[in-house]
Amino acid sequence: MITAPSWRVAVAGSHRHVFANPLGHVFEIGCFAAAPGCAAVGSPTSDFSWFPGTLWQVAVCVACGLHLGWRYVQTDGGTFFGLILDRLHQTPENLA
């Protein structure tokens, strides 16, 4: 399990966001308080952060290494994940 619907959170007023990176790749992401199926890779950076005042790291699947999104660290020390929605699949056990 990557994450669960119960861990959805609103960041900057919404759970869902659409952003483009500096190369023009567009991502629809959802924000989650937890994503135990993700591992953060690399050092946190503020470069091109989509959420002002946050640092980010790439988040990959712990099982296969697929890029699933980003882990964000807020100035108050809190964290959340911005996960690429079309890379997440719901299974019966996480629909409850």
Feature locations, PLM:
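A short Gly-Trp-Pro
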Residues: 1-96
